[in-house]
């Protein structure tokens, strides 16, 4: 996987050699000088579906994602980006090592894509590291 310079806030994938399901949140552009919005897109890839959903994130959204990661570490369901202004993202622990991930484009297409995933051990710590990298984009 080749990442661009700005990377991905979220990257959840099945192990190599399995279904190949991937859900990611790519950072497309840095905030404008003095700006407080990050231009991103959710990308969902399965054997039969590939879709992308534009999303704009604020620093408050990043704080909410940090809280969501804490809930996931406690094996709890999370729903992130619930304001209705953008795509909604949900993760539900469903089995040991397994999660159900859904992306719902309420404001625009009304499409929901749900994907079962078995991310690698340590995936929550990986998401936390990605969050810290993305937060640095806001600070310069």
Residue ranges and their predicted role:
Residues 32-74:
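Short, well-structured hydrophobic secondary-structure segments
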Residues 106-140:
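Mixed-charge, glycine-accented linear interaction segment located at domain edges/termini
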